Amino acid sequence: MEKIRLGDLVEFQRGYDLPKNEFKNGNIPVISSNGILGYHNEVKVKEIGITIGRSGTVGFPYLIKQDFFPHNTTLFIKNFNGNNVIYIYYLLKSLNLNEYKSGSGVPTINRNHLHPLKVTATKNKETQQKIAKILSDIDDKIEVLHQINDNLSELAKTIYDYWFVQFDFPDENGKPYKTSGGKMVYNDILKREIPEGWEVKSLGEIEPNIITGKTPTTKDENNFNGNILFITIDDIRQNLFIYNSERTLSEKGANTQRAKFLKKGDICVSCIGTVGVIGIVGKIAQTNQQINSISNPQNFNKYFLLNYLDRYFKDNFTAKKGAVLDNMNKAEFESIIIINPIQNIKEIYYGKVKFLYKKIDTNIQQIQHLQFLRDWLLPMLMNGQISVE
């Protein structure tokens, strides 16, 4: 390893202007500082490349493994000078380039900030390839696990829709209920038919243990930075099962609000700011006041309600998009109308999907272990503390 000017390794160039109203129909991703902004019909970089946020979200590298159009909110690498593209990507990830931003308003970074930087790196192509392979193999495993989880989640939702939206759950003969002529009864509240024996209830009637989160006083710094998760909306966005949080509480801080404790299996739902982001607690936790949680849900209700609420919020709110939406207080959350099947049907559904969610849970834990391993290896591989010779 040696100290090298970043500009001697690669050459950065500012992205191209493309107002939103000038996008043309196409399949070429337009890469902005936040990722894919949209799609266009013009290629500016072929096959594979790297961008870095130039304004707004600054300094974070993106690896794009296809033709793309770099937006003017990014810098892109115009010339790799024969260096391994994947190695350069991980090198940039290790540099914390966000620290080099400038501007008191919207933060910016340009190539004049980056080219003079002295970085610890290697020009040896074989070493670059070995480092790139170690780290990319880990990321490839992570990507496969994410794809598996997406497929498992989609399967569970498909079963849910078939049973509880189309009402084609198996009848006593194992045949699809509604399609096979199962009796439907008109419901005055819903103004439509539902299967005979099903009820319309509020969420609070079905699961009465609803907890609204709270933040301990921030005047006492000893309330924070312990080993108890303090879940916010951003933490729920990361994974369905929540094992990590950006902030944590100490036992002292959590014990100032003991009624707010949640345990593994409780369901968290964001109800302020962005409404309808849903996750399942992975270990002992508390949440902030933007989240209502279903505490200690009965097993046969857990995944039924998870999918019911997910569909409810998608139908009634633009959830999970980061927009500021109408808030929902605890009373409104508890009053959400649920089409409640007979318990036996929910128990059979739980039996069918619990193994899918168990696998999702296991995969998430494996993903987080691999992410920890990658992030631990990254700086040591880049500065030569771990040899690949």
Task: Cite the ranges covered by each PLM segment.
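A generic structural signal for residues embedded in beta-strands
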Residues: 269-270
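Non-catalytic DNA-recognition/assembly elements of restriction-modification systems
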Residues: 1-32, 120-162, 181-214, 335, ...
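Sequence-specific dsDNA recognition surfaces
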Residues: 4-50, 56, 62-65, 69-72, ...
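Short, solvent-exposed loop/beta-turn-alpha elements that line the ligand-binding surface or hinge
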Residues: 174-176
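Basic, amphipathic alpha-helical recognition segments used for DNA target recognition
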Residues: 3-10, 43, 60-129, 202-208, ...
